[in-house]
Amino acid sequence: MCPARSLLLVATLVLLDYLSLARNLSVATPGPEMFPCLHHSQNLLKAASNTLQKARQILEFYPCTSEEIDHEDITKDKTSTVEACLPLELIKNESCLNSRETSVITKGSCLASRKTSFMMALCLRSIYEDLQIYQVEFKTMNAKLLMDPKRQIFLDQNILGVIDELMQALNFNSETVPQKSSLEEPDFYKTKIRLCILLHAFRIRAVTIDRVMSYLNAS
């Protein structure tokens, strides 16, 4: 058995390093089906980076830098992108993957090369679910920010648009995640701090998604 925390940490580091190397070294021609997803993932990363930079500039007197915020992964225990998107070259017969999806479908066995198409589908579905979770969070937060009399900051339609475009390109049918609502009076200071936290986390996930798409496109 592999300890869950150690596996997740190692898997994350190995995945990002491997996918970065694969993207830099690969000279393969983009496939017609994957290319739109790669294009959309690049737009996603650009929008995530620009939105975070803009937020840090506007909220310069708030704790909004990477060193100041409390990092949070809102997809934790909901999706398994890191595990599902591990390159098959790194998955050996003796490897252990403690994810809900793989343990159920492979019935506890370790993954083999015949699982290539299945693992790709699982990876892309997990990415879709990540985007869906962030989409709901951002829309909920934007609704609160638009209530702020100061109108200091709110999310523009660009980042929400590129999230939707990549989700459409992935084309998975999934249950609609209900948008959160609250009857409480919003605390705009806390909302802006949470915006910073989510934008930092989303940019990290956008980096992962872009590298995964680059790797899959070149495979």
From Swiss-Prot:
Its main location: secreted. InterPro entries: 4_helix_cytokine-like_core (IPR009079), IL-12 (IPR050676), IL-12_alpha (IPR004281). It comes from the Eukaryota. Disulfide bonds join C37-C110, C64-C196, C85-C123. Keywords: Cytokine, Disulfide bond, Glycoprotein, Growth factor, Secreted, Signal. The keyword Disulfide bond applies. GO terms for cellular component: extracellular space. Heterodimerizes with IL12B to form the IL-12 cytokine or with EBI3/IL27B to form the IL-35 cytokine. IL-12 is primarily produced by professional antigen-presenting cells (APCs) such as B-cells and dendritic cells (DCs) as well as macrophages and granulocytes and regulates T-cell and natural killer-cell responses, induces the production of interferon-gamma (IFN-gamma), favors the differentiation of T-helper 1 (Th1) cells and is an important link between innate resistance and adaptive immunity. Heterodimer with IL12B; disulfide-linked. This heterodimer is known as interleukin IL-12. Heterodimer with EBI3/IL27B; not disulfide-linked. This heterodimer is known as interleukin IL-35. Interacts with NBR1; this interaction promotes IL-12 secretion. Belongs to the IL-6 superfamily. This is Interleukin-12 subunit alpha.
